[in-house]
């Protein structure tokens, strides 16, 4: 598997990157929402670590199961056709949460940490798909995570990859963590 192993210093940089992003969203009065599976709400949590985030975070969905994704607007046919761990599902998650909260930005992220998902036999450990929906555009990404020391570090690693993409979209200079 590819990817760096996170440590405490990297965690601080990731948290600081989210403060930058959240500050930018507050300044621009842009709203954001998330539909998170692998990160289980970590991205929304990082956003709300900045004072004033209630002005921009419209809400967030933690959709750990396939059923939860479907209940929140991901078409069942997308999951059945492409699998829950796919760019198509991540894109549908980003669109569904953006639409549900009428937000400017929607983030969808799905994947596995270091184990096979017993409910989805097609899962590959460390495989992550994500999407950022802004206006009528969706930017999606894929990466493989190497083994991390804790569940928190898996979530932070995945959250940082999303932050890098969101930073590019917003034109926010991010401090490099995973490069």
Label each residue range with its predicted role.
Residues 2-179:
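Short alpha-helical segments enriched in small residues
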